[in-house]
Amino acid sequence: MIISASTDYRAAAKAKLPPFLFHYIDGGSYDERTLKRNTDDLGDVALRQRVLRDMTDLSLETEIFGEKLAMPIALAPVGLTGMYARRGEVQAAKAAEKKGIPFTMSTVSVCPIEEVAPAIERPMWFQLYVLKDRGFMKNVLERAKAAGVTTLVFTVDMPVPGARYRDMHSGMSGPNAAMRRVFQAMRHPSWALDVGLLGKPHDLGNISTYRGEPTKLEDYIGWLGANFDPSISWKDLEWIRDFWDGPMVIKGILDEEDAKDAVRFGADGIVVSNHGGRQLDGVLSTAKALPSIADAVKGDLKIFVDSGIRTGLDVVRMLALGADCTLLGRSFVYALAAQGGAGVENLLDLYDKEMRVAMTLTGAKTIADLSRDSLVKIP
């Protein structure tokens, strides 16, 4: 398969992966309306073309929390990344480091913190869920500190799991799921060898280290379901703010009032996110939610955004709408599944090229030059 654009990796991943894994990363909740709107609404944002400007010194570099980024992108936390390529978290982290951007590790990664952190020199970021098991939360935060993690990304939009109907049909869950996954793996021998056999252990590494015993993937849904905490409030986050020395980012903000609460709480950043359309279907796309949030809190903290970003042009659109930096989730996992770490590197090269074209033709020589003036209209 020819990869000529960043969006080509989705088809490549679909061809290589067993359906239960492809649809797990590709799908959304309920009728997947928000999932679709994320990409559609962002694609409708019209860039303002400007010409006859000297763009010879164009730069994509930016700085977040004192950390230099080669471009305003970080790899987002994605659960089970290690099921998409052999020791996938390690491969993705190395690719991000090589391209000069941060890698964010998920709480529910296959590889544990202690495996990924030593594989790279650049400090990684770490994502944590709000869980009933506060002992686990404290344990994993202590381990993240010891591993040199700089930035904590705290996910707050999963007090309960979203209803992802596609998973029931694909074999990720539902009747006879384990048997269905085995049959699917047999029909995808490349994945079965590279990940199914050579990528073991298939553990939830961070959880297994805490529990002192292997955590099979079959335990994934059950453990998370039992530990989501719908009682969580801003007050419950205070001990984490006190415990964590570095920057703390609140992920899952879609409303300007919640963004203002994050400022009052003392967060260093927020992620404008609807969890990639995987939680509450029917909410705003991030492209629609971002402008009013940026109007409310821009300059008070760093604004990240995810959900629906598939190209370098999309990154430029999000920055023009008010974001300081973007997070890539599905996009990098598609590339990882298709071509491993080399695929992620190539994907980021494609994003780089796409951003440079968009910025050249909008007259933005630096990331700071991107603003609402770079758009024809705000959707």
Swiss-Prot record:
Spans through the membrane: none
Catalytic activity entry: (S)-lactate + A = pyruvate + AH2
Reported cofactor(s): FMN
Active site: 275 (proton acceptor)
Alphabetic keyword roster: Cell inner membrane, Cell membrane, Flavoprotein, FMN, Membrane, Oxidoreductase
Membrane topology (UniProt): Peripheral membrane protein
Top-level taxon of the source organism: Bacteria
GO biological process annotation, one example: lactate metabolic process
Pfam families: FMN_dh (PF01070)
Binding residues for substrate: 24, 129, 164, 278
Domain FMN hydroxy acid dehydrogenase: 1-379
Location(s), subcellular: Cell inner membrane
Similarity comment: Belongs to the FMN-dependent alpha-hydroxy acid dehydrogenase family.
Protein name: L-lactate dehydrogenase
Biological source species: Vibrio parahaemolyticus serotype O3:K6 (strain RIMD 2210633)
